[in-house]
Curated annotation (Swiss-Prot):
<feature type="active site" description="Proton acceptor">
    <location>
        <position position="72"/>
    </location>
</feature>
<dbReference type="GO" id="GO:0005737">
    <property type="term" value="C:cytoplasm"/>
</dbReference>
<dbReference type="GO" id="GO:0016853">
    <property type="term" value="F:isomerase activity"/>
</dbReference>
<comment type="similarity">
    <text>Belongs to the histidine racemase family.</text>
</comment>
<keyword id="KW-0413">Isomerase</keyword>
<feature type="active site" description="Proton donor">
    <location>
        <position position="211"/>
    </location>
</feature>
<comment type="subunit">
    <text>Homodimer.</text>
</comment>
<comment type="function">
    <text>Isomerase that catalyzes the conversion of L-histidine to D-histidine. Functions the biosynthesis of the metallophore staphylopine, which is involved in the acquisition of nickel, cobalt, zinc, copper, and iron, and thus enables bacterial growth inside the host, where metal access is limited. Therefore, this enzyme probably contributes to staphylococcal virulence. The reaction is reversible in vitro, the enzyme can produce D-histidine from the L-stereoisomer and vice versa.</text>
</comment>
<protein>
    <recommendedName>
        <fullName>Histidine racemase</fullName>
        <ecNumber>5.1.1.24</ecNumber>
    </recommendedName>
</protein>
<keyword id="KW-0963">Cytoplasm</keyword>
Length: 273
């Protein structure tokens, strides 16, 4: 039996365990490789990204591709951490290319090893109602270039609500333009977010320990609710906290960035069938 060798590192950005693959593979294999690596019986993580380039020619060639071609804020922070650990960065501010985002992503390294990522811009923000089970829930629908989020205010995150959300996500026929669908259960009083991310391409549905893009959506939610900017607003999540800075400009729309810390927990080789 031939087994394929995968060179990887595993990172911890606020509990959202992330694997970045260093070895080169055909893009058609990304989903299959990721599904095996993510399994609880394997290396185990919440998402997998593939490093396509660590070269920096004019700041445009750092390139990260996620297994479902989605954008991921925590994986981008993990990629920044990798670039810094490998001494590949010349400046504290730079840009990287990430799947699911047509523009280059502005990044920065701050004191105390905080990494900041400029997040994709919301294209449309509208209040809506979601019918789940026998209940109707008020939500804020936030549509991005390649994904959609629903921020649902809750007083408490319960198992019952989580099951309703899971069923809702699976039952919908999502547009092919959405690489990911996020259901963000948000307790405003505690500033606590419980994020669910669904990736249609690989049929991955995970209650994440933390979510960078979801944190950005909480920033947009705050802007919309309070009609005011927020800076380094702490969003607590099951695996840790992420900071969000967000403001709404009349001409530019919502401008949002997230900031967090990352640690390396493992590096080595994995074997897949």
């Amino acid at each position: 039996m031939n087994r394929q060798v995968i060179e990887f590192s595993k990172y911890n950005p606020s509990g959202n365990m992330t694997i970045l693959v260093h070895s080169k593979h055909d893009a058609s294999e990304y989903a299959s490789i990721a599904n095996q690596l993510m399994a609880a019986t394997h290396v185990c993580c919440e998402q997998v990204g593939f490093i396509e380039s660590t070269q920096n020619d004019d700041g445009n060639d750092f390139h990260l591709v996620m297994s479902g071609n989605e954008f991921c804020g925590n994986a981008t922070m993990s990629y920044i951490h990798h670039l810094q650990e490998s001494h590949l960065l010349k400046d504290q501010q730079f840009k990287v290319k990430v799947s699911g985002c047509s523009d280059l992503v502005q990044c920065a390294i701050h004191d105390c090893q905080y990494y900041e990522v400029q997040m994709p811009q919301a294209h449309r923000v509208v209040p809506t109602t979601i019918n789940m089970g026998n209940h109707s829930w008020k939500a804020l629908e936030i549509i991005y270039e390649t994904y959609v989020h629903y921020v649902i205010p809750v007083k408490q995150v319960t198992t019952e609500i989580q099951h309703l959300v899971e069923a809702f996500v699976r039952e919908q026929q999502w547009s092919h333009k959405y690489k990911t669908v996020g259901m963000m259960l948000f307790d405003e009083q505690r500033q606590f977010l419980q994020p669910l991310i669904y990736i249609p391409e690989i049929q991955s549905l995970i209650w994440e320990n933390s979510c960078g893009s979801g944190t950005a959506s909480i920033g947009v939610f705050n802007n919309y609710q309070r009609n005011d900017a927020c800076k380094d607003f702490t969003v607590h999540q099951p695996g840790g906290s992420i900071l969000v800075t967000s403001k709404r400009c009349h001409q530019l729309g919502y401008q949002t960035s997230i900031k967090g810390q990352v640690t390396t927990v493992a590096t080595g080789k994995a074997y897949i069938e």
